[in-house]
């Protein structure tokens, strides 16, 4: 992998590096016992840094705004919902970022497990928020890998009368060869692909070609279908 000349500094990727939000090699095994050469850890350390979380929320908001603008949907009410638990604060940060603009976005929240109240309309719901069929729902998550949690979230929201219009993630690992429409019936967008992230860290001399090639080889050989 060759260096890119005159690389433009990316404040988010620099922040990921400085805060240790991107784990490589043995660090992944130590933290999560996973056998992967790279892990995007938008959890503990991100939650401790509210400035970084706010920056990421603004970036997700700007991406969502550009997507709806391209689809000529700026006049359509929008809502973001994060896949629990990791993306719950990401979605909330996105909605909060929008409140400072002329294009506010609504917020909804999911539970990992349905509520266990005795009964009533919301007693067994996995969703907390307004159900408005006029809104376009964007599902927020940290990483796209197999798509399993996305399919689960879409099914749960459908039970509540919500249809997901699009999925927006921070990093897309691009480890899926195909996704059948009945499994994931909406487009996927991201702030970064795994290749873009790796190229940036190589070009800024944070990792070398050996590490980069190991990561990309792993991603390209471990596919989800």
Over which residues does each language-model region extend?
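Short active-site segment of divalent metal-dependent hydrolases/proteases
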Residues: 145
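PRPP-associated nucleotide enzymes
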Residues: 1-140, 148-225
